[in-house]
Amino acid sequence: MDNSVHNNSNTTHPDKSRASIVNGVREERVSLSTEPPAGVKGGDNGPITVGDYNKLESRLQGAGMEDSVDELQHITDDVMPLSLLLSRLAQFSHLKLQELILDLASKPLPENTLNGNAKGSMNSSINGNVNAGVNGVPKLPSPALEDTSPESLNKKTMILKFIQDLHSRWVKALVITEWARNADEVGKLIDLRTHLAAKLELYNRAFWNMVNLKHEMAFAKVPSPDLKTALEVLSTGAVHWMPDFGYLPKPPLTTQETLHWLNEIEVVLHMRLQLHEYEQIPEPWKEYKIDNGRVTFTVPGEFEVDLTISDEDFDKQFWFLDYRTIFSPSPSKLSDGARGFIEARVNTILETEGLLGCYKYLHELTLTTKIGEFARQAVELSRTGLWTQTLRVERLNRALGIQYWSQSLHTQDSQSWILLGVHSGKSSDGADDPSSPSRLMLQWFRDGKEVKDADIPLDTDTISTEKLLMTVISRHIKYLLSSIYNSLSSKPRYAQKRGRLSLRISDPPHLDCALTMQTLGADHAVLGIGPWSGNFFFADRPPFGVGWANKINTLRNPVTEAPVVLEQLRWYHMTLHLRTLPKPADWKVLPKAPVPLDEVKRVVYSRASTTREPFHAIFLRNSRWTPQWFAMMSLSLGGDRWWTAEGHGIPGLRINIFTELSITPTDLLLPSSPLFSKLTQHATNIMDQIHDFRVLHQQHIQYTARKASPDGHRTTVVLSADMLPLQPDPDGTTQPTWAGRFIQLDYKGPAPITPSEYRESLADPKSVRRQPTRQKVMIEATVGVLHPTKFRLLRHRLDRDVLYDRRLGHFTLRFQPASGAGIIPLLRSRVQSLDRLVDIVDALHLRGKQISPKKITLREIVFSYGNGSPTMSLSNPRPKFGGNKQRSWEVRLNLAAEQGVDVILEAGNPHLRAIDYLRSAANSVHLKKLPAWFVFTLPLYEALEQLHDSWDAILAKDLGTCYVFHKSLDWLTIRFALSGAKNRLVQLDIRPRDRNGHINWHISRAKTDPNINNENDEFNKILKQRVWSISGNGFKGLGNSATAQWDHGIGPLLAVINEALQSLAGTPPPPQVPTQIQQPQQPSPHPQQAQVQEQRQQPQQQQQANPLQGAAVPGRFPHQLQQGQQLSYQQQARLQQQQRQQQQQQQQQQHMHNQNQAQQAQQRAAMNDINTPVVVLD
């Protein structure tokens, strides 16, 4: 019952009509009344009040009790309340009722009910008829009408048992509830009874305590003094009533008698030990000494004992005289108490067991004494000096346990100690072995495990606990340091001599006993172990002091975990050194890894063949690199390595490419650390080489990479055919390449900073936040040549970045691209430019003395041509031999122009009239033919200049003029226009033609001329009469045309033509004969040729409307034009120039895309027209 019942015993529930229902059971509080029950009478002093504690308390307070008393201890503390018991019983009843209903429902029904023939009241109930009695009271069914089937009886039995069980339970609950009505008063009485019994027990305990105290003080009781005896002794010095026996003392022995008896005793001892008891003497006592009437048995390193005899009878016992220990430290003499104890004990053993028992007893006693001396010294060491609080000494009967390094942190879980005890000397089967007596035995337990075959020397002659501990600790230190050394030395870093590791062991241990590990350069971590404390410490290096030593000391197993901590110490030192190392401004150490740890493991463990050691990675980045690239230094026992890696896509996802760098730890050493310079060189070369690999792979170009040199230079070899593919000539033939088979790319590292970049780096970084310039790399490409003799015209330096070595016969191309940009596109462009240069140089070489090269570089080629050709006069049809020589003209080819190759001619050059065609040819496959073309066409163009000059006088009289139209480099048209009543016009085409391997100029009337076949035409008549039918110096008439040599014949031929046509100037035209001339049917040209021909004819048709216009060359006016003619000429010239440019572009595209079709079309055109020349400018 809870305490609330005691405190509110006089109260009732505030609402008696209300009751709480728990699991269907109504719970009502039971009021505990304090009124006396009926029939109870009062006592002698008045009525009896049951449980009225409140009145009693008020009476005590009224009596003047000022101090409150302690509350009585209630027996109902921690007792289950009645309400909980009733609620649990209600829950139990409810659950049992549910189980009963389910069990009854699962039982089978009676057969009569299933058949519809139920009897008795069951049937009546089903049919709705209830037997009623008097006044409507239902009648009880008679026994004959009850359902007596076995199923129903079984169900009724179950219900009856259930009701009986619950009834018994609730009856008990009712009894408890009824009793609980007076539980408050009864509980208080019990509390009071318990309290009084406890007080009574205190009286009994006090009594017995006094009795025990009296018994325990008996030793302190002082007897009453004997004053009478004391007075007599102090007065007279004797007591007369004490008895005196009157014995006479024996006379003392003389010296002779003493020597005699001693001699007799020695003789008897010799006889007894030699003859009678020699076999019973223990083996350690076989060597003994007899002197002074005694025999002295000695056990080396243990004790000496003196024995004697008192009788000549050999069966009598020996007697103990003296016992001395002969080990040190030991007491010089025994105390009286110890001597008396040993003497009594030894004499008893000699009487019962003889000499063998005496030896065993004294031997065991000595061993125990030695163990005690070891224990005494151990306790003294643990309290003084360096051993204070480092030892824990424990005596175990005759054994001694000494735990050392008790305060060391790494030995708390696995303690180490030595155990010194006595070995029985018995064999394995428990039998005594006389040859092996008991002895001291030492056992060493290291880290909680016994060390077998430790072979620790134990000096029992000179006992020194400190020396013994030092010997054991020396073995332990050697074990720890050797285990750490073996663990480290087996790793690849030290096995491959990449780091220094040494072990020094001294016995006994001292500070020289240490493990020395190289951290970086001359820096070493010297690990030692304190022999007294057992703690690890680092010597000679304050940075490696308390922190890292404590970390090792807290390890549970230093043997396996200390190597990892030492490696972490090296990582820390390397990281600290790298962060404090002076570095360029563009280098920085990243605070965290730019890629996940799994990717870093993939890189570091790519070189791990068998084991994967823990590692530490330091990441660096150069601000002049692309963000995807970074450098990494991995430190591990597998080896320190430097890596260059490229992140894939977004930084922080994965590593795409990584490469190991050949950087050694010595590169980090001061004062001149080459780390960052080597790192920059290695990483820059790798980035550009990898970028070039990607480009080569994408373009399906074969390549190979050679092994990198120690200085970081890398080499890639590609096929020159891939950089310079063989291109067919316009005639369809394929020219052999001039370059060697391979092109070697050498990556030389970062390019030196330019002065502008240096000045920018020195600027104030706080002024403007600038984006750092990209790092540039130096790359050299070596292109060999197959025939060095062809390149004798080249100088050593062709350009700022292009060199030619005549002795070795190769070109050296130097590049300085941005880091990570690669050079494959630049290399291809530069090699193609070099190929273009080689073609021109080859062409210049083939021309020999006809062309004089002045400057040959990759950007510009300057040469002159024209020396040695004779000059002819147009007024004289025949050239004057031995006349003035023509001057040389200079040509400048700008190979580095923005629009391609630019042809620059000096003022007055005859070829200025075809400058547009020259520039177009220079940017096509005909570039290498330009030098030959200049030489081949120079006589023609100089003759054309003289032709223009000869018509100046005729033009001044308005009698006629002439001008030249250039349709291509090898096709031009001369138009002669004469004045008169009707405009008279003739056009002559000049084209080269190959006959028997010789190139000649062929001149004929243009096919577009309508009077080409008109025999009555005045131009046909005079040309046929004075030109087509004659031959001269270097030219020959062909009936309707003429051919001339390119060098000596074209000038005289043009002079003859010019003289014939000028003769018609100023003459009236002949009368026109109306004859219809049937034009020959021309073959249908190819559609492409028709389009080109239409474009070419269009400007000619426009020119025919006004034959007296100025010269056809834009910007050239050799004659004084009439008013209005100059503007008309300029407009027409610009229109012709635009048409020619469009025509050139169309021709070039047509030639590049449909080269074969163009060749076939040219062949068909040549077959249809025999007058079409074949142009070969070589």
From Swiss-Prot:
Disulfide bonds: none annotated. Residues 1074-1112, 1119-1164 have a biased composition (Low complexity). It is found in: Nucleus. Residues 1-12 have a biased composition (Polar residues). Keywords: Activator, Nucleus, Transcription, Transcription regulation. Residues 1-50, 1064-1178 are annotated as: Disordered. GO terms for cellular component: core mediator complex; mediator complex. The keyword Repeat does not apply. Its main location: nucleus. GO terms for biological process: regulation of transcription by RNA polymerase II. Transmembrane segments: none annotated. GO terms for molecular function: transcription coregulator activity. Belongs to the Mediator complex subunit 14 family. PANTHER family: MEDIATOR COMPLEX SUBUNIT (PTHR12809), MEDIATOR OF RNA POLYMERASE II TRANSCRIPTION SUBUNIT 14 (PTHR12809:SF2). Component of the Mediator complex, a coactivator involved in the regulated transcription of nearly all RNA polymerase II-dependent genes. Mediator functions as a bridge to convey information from gene-specific regulatory proteins to the basal RNA polymerase II transcription machinery. Mediator is recruited to promoters by direct interactions with regulatory proteins and serves as a scaffold for the assembly of a functional preinitiation complex with RNA polymerase II and the general transcription factors. Component of the Mediator complex. This is Mediator of RNA polymerase II transcription subunit 14. It comes from Chaetomium globosum (strain ATCC 6205 / CBS 148.51 / DSM 1962 / NBRC 6347 / NRRL 1970).
